[in-house]
């Protein structure tokens, strides 16, 4: 089980690594479940999960996988038309896309970009809300506006530019989680070892 944010990226950018794992472990049956809600692994809905928050369950084994750093991004098309913001106050002149309601937020403070540089609890009004990070990415790529996105998701993009790179947003921890009852299970150990051996590639 993994959030749509992580799952979509794994299927698109990390497909060669998934194929490598399947080639090295042909006996392991893989089923990917994209779910933004944290399901109860003890019910055996899945063997492992990638959670965007540290799990509270005492019967889980967990290890931090990666820090997801958020920044504001815009497409070349958008920035050529509206200009590159130089200061946080310049953001008031720009169009924003934000994370909408209806799904768990993948960050603790999804409205931080709307509030950046604002005072007295005020925030900018987005022109569009999307309840998935991949939806935000597609909207940014299309030139709709600026949005807060995880750095690793756009690290290889040639169409998207980081705006105000010194203004770093919240950091979200991704955790690799599985029940203690599966601690010595070969398929769990195989995927855990493979995933952590590739985490350096995932960060780049």
Give the residues covered by each predicted segment.
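Short loop/edge segments at beta-strand edges and connector loops
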Residues: 32-36, 164
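C-terminal regulatory
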Residues: 43, 55-171, 200-204
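Residues at or immediately flanking beta-strands
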Residues: 2, 25-31, 173-175
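Single conserved hydrophobic/aromatic residue that forms the stacking wall/gate
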Residues: 1-7, 11-12
């Amino acid at each position: 089980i993994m959030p749509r944010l992580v799952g979509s990226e794994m299927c698109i950018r990390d497909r060669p690594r998934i194929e490598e794992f399947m080639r090295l472990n042909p006996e392991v049956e893989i089923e990917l479940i994209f779910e933004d809600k944290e399901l109860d692994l003890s019910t055996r809905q899945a063997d492992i999960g990638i959670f965007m928050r540290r799990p509270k369950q005492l019967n889980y084994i967990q290890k931090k996988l990666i820090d997801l750093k958020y920044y504001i991004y815009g497409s070349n098309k958008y920035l050529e038309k509206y200009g590159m913001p130089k200061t946080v106050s310049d953001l008031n002149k720009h169009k924003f896309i934000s994370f909408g309601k209806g799904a768990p937020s993948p960050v603790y403070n999804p409205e931080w970009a709307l509030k950046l540089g604002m005072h007295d609890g005020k925030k900018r009004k987005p022109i569009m809300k999307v309840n998935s990070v991949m939806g935000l990415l597609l909207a940014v790529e299309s030139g709709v506006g600026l949005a807060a996105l995880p750095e690793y998701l756009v690290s290889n993009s040639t169409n998207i530019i980081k705006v105000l790179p010194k203004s770093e947003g919240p950091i979200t921890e991704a955790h690799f989680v599985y029940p203690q009852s599966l601690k010595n299970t070969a398929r769990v150990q195989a995927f855990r070892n493979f995933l952590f051996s590739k985490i350096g590639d995932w960060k780049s």
